[in-house]
Amino acid sequence: SDNRINDYLIGIEKFHEVADYITINISSPNTENLRNFHDERKLQDLLKSVSEKKKSLDSNIPIVVKISPDIDENQINLISEILLENDISGIIISNTSESSRDILKNIQRHQKGGLSGKPIEKKSNLLINKFYNLLKGKIKIIGVGGVDSGQSAYEKFLLGADYIQLYTGMVFQGPNIASIIKKDLKELLTRDGVKNFSEIIGNKTLS
């Protein structure tokens, strides 16, 4: 599109009355130049426009931003600042990765496309923890990347995620994985004497 920001605004206008929340995805590796929105000026312009559109619609729809895992320390700090300056409810950490392929064994590891699941779990977890420390509970964190068990989900909560999402785990284990994770989480919470998830969110720090 010649006006990519307007594409997002049209989506908000069309769906703000029916959606539970709207994701501003700036991180798909399969969409040309989409990750340019991680640049400070471009992201600020986008989220300012999104906030103004919400206000013009008198809408309370939560807006969350989905980021790439392939970002550096400077980008982490800038993104955190920009999120806090705008009417943003959450951040999804993270989309698929274009790096981390050298750890794979499959001969097709260098094919084009986003890498998901276990190979990006550590990168996702580190980012969750960094953003948790910067956002200080003011913006909700949705953790994604390598969730395939109650333990892997629990780890993301400990590092600062308020919610989790999964896809690759469901591909390999089927939709019943949600019930398995729920059961495992209940056992882990009981084991640790935890009565509410809020007690464990952000209790662990990665160096």
Predicted regions and their residues:
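C-terminal helical cap(s) of enzyme catalytic domains, especially alpha/beta-barrels
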Residues: S100-G117, M170-K195
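Glycine-rich phosphate-binding active-site loops on the catalytic face of alpha/beta enzymes
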Residues: I26, G90-S100, G146, A153-I180
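Active-site glycine- and acidic-residue-rich loops that bind
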Residues: S1-L9, N36-H38, K42, V64-E85
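Generic structural signal for well-ordered alpha-helices
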Residues: Y8-H16, E40-S51, I76-E81, I128, ...
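Catalytic cores of alpha/beta
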Residues: I71-E85, Y132-G137, V147-I164
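Active-site beta->alpha loop and helix N-cap motifs at the rims of alpha/beta catalytic domains
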Residues: S1-T23, S28
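Glycine/Thr-rich beta-alpha phosphate-binding loop at enzyme active sites
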Residues: P29-H38, I76, E81-G137
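Short beta-strand/loop segments at the ligand-binding rim of alpha/beta enzyme cores
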Residues: S56-P69, N133-G143
